[in-house]
Amino acid sequence: MGRMKPIPWLVSILLGLSGYSISYADTLAPVSAIHISGNHFVDGSGQTIQLRGASISGLETVAVQGWDPSNPWGSQSGEATPNWKLLKNWNMNIVRLPLNEASWLGYKCADATGALRDPDPGHNYQATVKQGVAEATAAGLYVIIDLHLTAPKNFCPLAQNPMADAENSISFWKSVATTFKGYPNVLFELFNEPFMYWLATPNTEWQAAMQGGMVTQYVTGAPTPYQAAYSWKTAGMQQMLDTVRATGATNPVLIAGIQWSGDLSKWLDNAPKDSLKQIAAVWHPYPAYGTTWGTMPYTLPSGGAAAYANAQAILNAGIPVILTETGDRNAPGTVGAPFMSKLLPWADKAGVSYLGWTWDVWQNGDFVLIKDKSGTPSDGYGVYFKQHLGCVSKSPAAACP
């Protein structure tokens, strides 16, 4: 077998990172560029690819909470930094990195008590993210950079808020797109999960999510008050997309639906315009999780027949759909994954990409893929997900349960 040759753009990026070094060996994994053609993702040679992977949680919370100033990853995956080889061993080809806008931008922010805190206490957040993207790239993975936690004004992003904010989120995307536009294997997910509560404008939820609007409260992240009165302007998907494109970035951009990214019913009517035609729709299907999240209604399940039909309509219109989050039950002793065993075969047949939430060693009974730092799959969900990825990597998708 011939030895792999280094990819010129990858080598130049890795060698150019401050404080990051690699041995110059021609054994780098052959990660390719990615772009959108019709309703599929394609690689640098124009071959259709299906993205299958996982999110790694930690970067969105660890630094802003001050858990471990020395390490913004917080060892949430069981080790100080993610073991990219384990993801590849699961036959994954993509990883999603959820970020915190205050930690990336580095401005002092106020918690629910009014006390100021440093969301980048180790002054290492950007360097950590850059190194993580470089390492994942060198391991042969595509990378999604996801704006996960936001907050208006100078409030700390300590919990999910209804939408990106007009001031900080625009600055975030200008900086992030400028930083990573040289990575043709990186995709930008503009905002994790719009839920558009407390609208003060006559706009519909869809208009406010895609074009911006006014919101009258924000989520503090504290037990009391969980939410607080404050009028602020959201950043619409169109404004954030325009900000990314203004940097010269041509990377694919991922656009969520509303209601925690579970509703795609009017996505086609309201999606932002991209002259490059490099956008995809984001859907977060989950099994029933309850009716509230904190004190707010949480409209799940998001995986009913209508949800599949909405996703199919977007595909039929020539636009890709990607599940940047999904999950199933994994409490100890769980056998099988009924939600996943319906969703993933459908996605394979439709050419829809998907990522599991989450590659972390939390001992939660839902939506956790692994038990330990060795990547042992969790009961139920984790076992099924790993087995399914192994099957589709070797066999036609139609042959994989």
Placement of each model-derived feature along the sequence:
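Bacterial N-terminal signal peptides
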Residues: 8-19
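Aromatic-lined substrate-binding rim segments of carbohydrate-active enzymes
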Residues: 69, 74-151, 166-169, 233-247, ...
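A mature extracytoplasmic/lumenal domain signature
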Residues: 55, 99-101, 147-149, 192, ...
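N-terminal secretory signal peptides that target proteins for export/translocation
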Residues: 1-4
